[in-house]
């Protein structure tokens, strides 16, 4: 029996992952719950396991142990086609494929839905940018296509992640190539996801990427350290020098939202 579209929660329990074909665990002891309308920022130093966690959340990499569940069903209980409809993913290394802009946003769905393409572009705040390209949504990209800046490609890829309103959207350093206008569009997109009851997970290197989230997960050395409300992190970081406080790190602390 086909599963119903997810609409309530993502639950990660004691999850660990290693890259396919390798034996070294790069991310472990991950525990958290998010409900629809919430957004999570994942922060931590370089090589702390953030991107590996993102790949596990969307099913690109399968957990070595533990589970990732959408509305109670583990990711491997969904067919790849169904999971693809319910999950949007913007990887750290953005790639647009040979074709036009509309096809890339529609994930090469055949035929693409024009209304859904437009809605995704508007949700990503990239519609005006696209209509100013040489051929608008028909502009060719990829090999032998129009040369786009890294920021333009990243914003179009954000629209692709939002296509057809997926329940879970995972964005890995989505503003690494964005200017101030792109940052603002990203924050609006995250707030838009929350407003329609979706879940957003944002791997962040620049603070502006987490402006629209309400929870923070801290990673270090491949392990979850904390899962706390964003305000708690900001309050601790903002303590004046006369009364210094540091973020208390509790290995393996889980949480729910």
Task: Give names to the regions the model predicted.
Residues 58:
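Helix-to-loop junction immediately C-terminal to a conserved catalytic motif
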Residues 66-73, 83:
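Conserved ABC transporter NBD signature motif
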Residues 69, 77, 102-143, 187-188, ...:
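ABC ATPase nucleotide-binding domain helical subdomain, centered on the C-loop/LSGGQ "ABC signature"
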Residues 165:
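Conserved catalytic motifs of ABC-family nucleotide-binding domains
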Residues 169-173:
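Catalytic Walker B motif of ABC-type/P-loop ATPase nucleotide-binding domains
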Residues 183-196:
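Helical segment within the ABC ATPase nucleotide-binding domain
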Residues 211-218:
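Conserved catalytic segment of ABC-fold P-loop ATPases
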């Amino acid at each position: 029996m086909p599963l119903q579209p997810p609409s309530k929660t993502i639950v990660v329990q004691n999850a660990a992952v290693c890259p396919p074909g390798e034996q070294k665990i790069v991310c472990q002891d991950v525990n958290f719950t998010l409900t629809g309308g919430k957004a999570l920022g994942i922060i931590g130093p370089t090589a702390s396991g953030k991107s590996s966690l993102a790949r596990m959340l969307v099913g690109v990499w399968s957990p070595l142990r533990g589970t990732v569940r959408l509305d109670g069903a583990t990711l491997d209980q969904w067919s790849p086609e169904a999971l693809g409809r319910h999950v949007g993913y913007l990887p750290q290394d953005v790639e647009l494929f040979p074709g036009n802009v509309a096809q890339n946003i529609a994930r090469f769905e055949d035929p693409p839905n024009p209304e859904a393409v437009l809605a995704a572009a508007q949700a990503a705040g990239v519609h005006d940018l696209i209509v100013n390209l040489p051929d608008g949504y028909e502009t060719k990209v990829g090999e032998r296509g129009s040369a786009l800046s890294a920021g333009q490609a990243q914003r179009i890829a954000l629209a692709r992640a939002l296509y057809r309103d997926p329940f879970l959207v995972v964005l890995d350093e989505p503003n690494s190539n964005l200017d101030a206008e792109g940052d603002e569009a990203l924050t609006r997109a995250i707030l838009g996801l929350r407003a329609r009851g979706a879940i957003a997970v944002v791997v962040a290197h620049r603070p502006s990427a987490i402006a629209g989230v309400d929870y923070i997960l801290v990673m270090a050395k491949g392990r979850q350290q904390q899962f706390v409300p964003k305000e708690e992190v900001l309050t601790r970081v903002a303590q004046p020098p006369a009364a210094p406080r540091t973020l208390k790190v509790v290995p393996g602390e889980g949480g729910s939202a």
